[in-house]
Amino acid sequence: MVDLLIPGPEGKIEAKYSHSNRDDSPIVVLLHPDPSKGGTMHTKIVFKMYKIFIKAGFSTIRFNFRGVGKSEGFFDDGEGELSDAACVLDWLQQYNTNSKICWVAGFSFGAWIAMQLLMLSLIHI
């Protein structure tokens, strides 16, 4: 596991990343619950998902939305958090160019952002 500070739209985004041993492994971005209600990348279910995806052979990243932990910026009611997620997904895809499978998963608020990210990705295809 590697600690990262990824450049984001409102400053640095704190992340934890585990790279698979396989060059063509699937990738996954994990999104945490509502920051305004105490959600972080360390939330129990997000941490467990992180471990499960690593065990399944995925290159896996979880991160804190803006204003949480070491991530810079302020909570933006979902709009800015979607930008954060898109930025982290872009970083992950650029770092794993041989991956053909990409997942995005979240819990509660994180699932809502994940669905928006999927819709945004479909628009840009």
What are these regions (language model features)?
Residues 1-4:
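A domain-start/cap signature at the N-terminus of enzymes
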Residues 97-107:
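Alpha/beta-hydrolase fold nucleophile elbow
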Residues 123-125:
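Conserved small/polar residues in nucleotide/adenosyl-binding loops
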Residues 85, 114-117:
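Hydrophobic packing residues within well-ordered alpha-helices of enzyme cores
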Residues 6-8, 12-97:
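Serine-hydrolase catalytic machinery in alpha/beta-hydrolase-like enzymes
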Residues 106-114:
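Gly/Ala-rich beta-loop-alpha elbow adjacent to hydrolase catalytic centers
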Residues 53, 117-118:
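Aromatic pocket-lining residues of Rossmann-like dinucleotide-binding sites
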